[in-house]
């Protein structure tokens, strides 16, 4: 089995890989210089679709419809595009060893890939209940969602268990989005999470109260303050019941788990400097190892706006960090300088007919504005966060494109504000005037 050698290798085939490939082409790439090595069987695609439109009962999203870079309004990069540009897509290939000093990767089949420059874009893997030793956690019809294969298995179960009972374990992004998707598919949905309210890392209790109330109106049962501690299975090995720590037992035809993710960095342990659970980089996504860059979920990078190191798990950062790394690689080859990465944290979600966006930092005092009652006709409300007399973060539900741009601008500029009363009174119009 002959070695293969490339000038550039992107390890990982997710969102970041696709956006990096596009940036390489934009910057100037010769055929045969770049390879993308991915354990998935398909070309890079927009992962957020899996928890949303992929699960719709009518007109669901399917590949090739959501290959990168459609998620940011760009061109859709089909497998033929990579071929035309002379980019090697090495799919269904798992790398089991990375020798960074030797600039060499080895696949599970023993094949060696050599590189001059490596971009680590390995992303994250889901945290499983079996990681905590939960009894029965390997039963059939317990699902996690990370890759398209996971989504396909869930789609099959949705068809097989039509109108059945679903228990969603977890109250974060995945839990809320999948809870909504399964309710739209006419399942009886219960959500279980240990925290006192949903999305606790971002939402205030007041923001969460709206979504919990709205979900309840849609017929979703929300059970807070407890966790799944075991599962009952039938003779086919399929899950039948979820046992909760508080003693309750829930019937379940399907269980969907969204309890977090961890960055895939184990290949590089002991070879590279790590921090905050990720691979430490500079503002150009260079790591401590020459000619090795890390982007997306795995990178712990300097967040210039707040003068601190952070690791961000979000598609927006995956796209932008990938582009920044490629620009930096090309600039260093040409002896040029580029601007430092200056990222504004951004999160969003869509479920049912709701859609929210958040920009900035959710630290300091939160000021809720608008009507956050689940019964309101408009569902229009938001929140600002004030720290040291400045607005540092902004959240908006059901905003227009102009209003969403306005809250992003506020979070970037961080205007001074004398009192929270002004924000309370003006609401979204405060952001629109900045």
From Swiss-Prot:
Entries under InterPro entries matching the protein: FAD-oxidoreductase/Apoptosis, FAD/NAD-bd_sf, FAD/NAD-binding_dom, FAD/NAD-linked_Rdtase_dimer_sf, MDHAR3-like_C
Keywords tagged on the record: Cytoplasm, FAD, Flavoprotein, NAD, NADP, Oxidoreductase, Redox-active center
Positions with a binding annotation for L-ascorbate: 319, 350
Localization in the cell: Cytoplasm
Gene3D superfamilies documented for this protein:
3.30.390.30, FAD/NAD(P)-binding domain
**Which cofactor does the UniProt annotation name?**
FAD
Which reaction(s) does the protein catalyse, per the Swiss-Prot or TrEMBL entry?
2 monodehydro-L-ascorbate radical + NADH + H(+) = 2 L-ascorbate + NAD(+)
User: Top EC class per UniProt?
Assistant: oxidoreductase
Q: Where does NADP(+) bind?
A: 173-177, 201, 260, 313-314, 348
Q: Name one GO cellular component term.
A: cytoplasm
Q: Where does NAD(+) bind?
A: 171-177, 195, 201, 260, 313-314, 348
The entry's FAD-binding residues are 13-16, 40, 47, 52, 95, 146-147, 297, 315, 348
Q: What is its EC number?
A: 1.6.5.4
**Gene Ontology MF term list:** monodehydroascorbate reductase (NADH) activity
Q: What is its main location?
A: cytoplasm
Q: Does the keyword Metal-binding apply?
A: no
The family annotation for this protein states:
Belongs to the FAD-dependent oxidoreductase family.
Function of this protein?
Answer: Catalyzes the conversion of monodehydroascorbate to ascorbate, oxidizing NADH in the process.
Q: What is this protein called?
A: Monodehydroascorbate reductase, seedling isozyme
């Amino acid at each position: 089995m002959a070695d293969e050698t490339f000038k550039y290798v992107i390890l990982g085939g997710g969102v970041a890989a696709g956006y990096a490939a596009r940036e390489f082409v934009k910057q100037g790439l010769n055929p045969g210089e770049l390879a993308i090595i991915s354990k998935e069987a398909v070309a890079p695609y927009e992962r957020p679709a899996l928890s949303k439109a992929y699960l719709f009962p009518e007109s669901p999203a399917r590949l090739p419809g959501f290959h990168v870079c459609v998620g940011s309004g760009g061109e859709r990069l089909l497998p033929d595009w990579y071929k035309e540009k002379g980019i090697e897509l090495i799919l269904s290939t798992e790398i089991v060893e990375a020798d960074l000093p030797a600039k060499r990767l080895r696949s599970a089949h023993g094949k060696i890939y050599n590189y001059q420059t490596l971009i680590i874009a390995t992303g994250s893997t889901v945290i499983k209940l079996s990681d905590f030793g939960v009894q029965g956690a390997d039963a059939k019809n317990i699902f996690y969602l990370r890759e398209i294969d996971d989504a396909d298995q869930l789609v099959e179960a949705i068809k097989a268990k039509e109108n059945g009972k679903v228990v969603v374990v977890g109250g974060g992004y995945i839990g809320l989005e999948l809870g909504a998707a399964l309710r739209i598919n006419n399942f009886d949905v219960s959500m279980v999470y240990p925290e006192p309210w949903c999305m606790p890392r971002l939402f205030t209790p007041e923001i969460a109260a709206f979504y919990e109330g709205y979900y309840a109106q849609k017929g979703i049962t929300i059970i807070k303050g407890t966790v799944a501690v075991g599962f009952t299975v039938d003779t086919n090995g399929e899950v039948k019941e979820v046992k909760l720590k508080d003693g309750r037992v829930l019937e379940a035809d399907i269980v969907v788990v969204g309890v977090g993710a961890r960055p895939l960095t184990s290949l590089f342990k002991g070879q590279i400097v790590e921090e905050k659970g990720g691979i430490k980089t500079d503002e150009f996504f260079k790591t401590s190892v020459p000619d090795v860059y890390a982007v997306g979920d795995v990178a712990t990078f300097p967040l210039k706006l707040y003068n601190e190191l952070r690791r961000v798990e979000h598609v927006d950062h995956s796209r932008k960090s990938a582009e920044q790394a490629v620009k930096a690689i090309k600039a260093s080859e040409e002896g040029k300088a580029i601007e430092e990465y200056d990222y504004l944290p951004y999160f969003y979600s869509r479920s049912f007919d709701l859609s929210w966006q958040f920009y900035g930092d959710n630290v300091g005092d939160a000021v809720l504005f608008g009507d956050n009652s689940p019964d309101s006709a408009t569902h229009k409300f938001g929140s600002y966060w004030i720290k040291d007399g400045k607005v540092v973060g902004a959240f908006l539900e059901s905003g227009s494109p102009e209003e969403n741009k306005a809250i992003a601008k506020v979070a970037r500029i961080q205007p001074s504000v004398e009192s929270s009363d002004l924000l309370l009174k003006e609401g979204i119009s405060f952001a629109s005037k900045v």
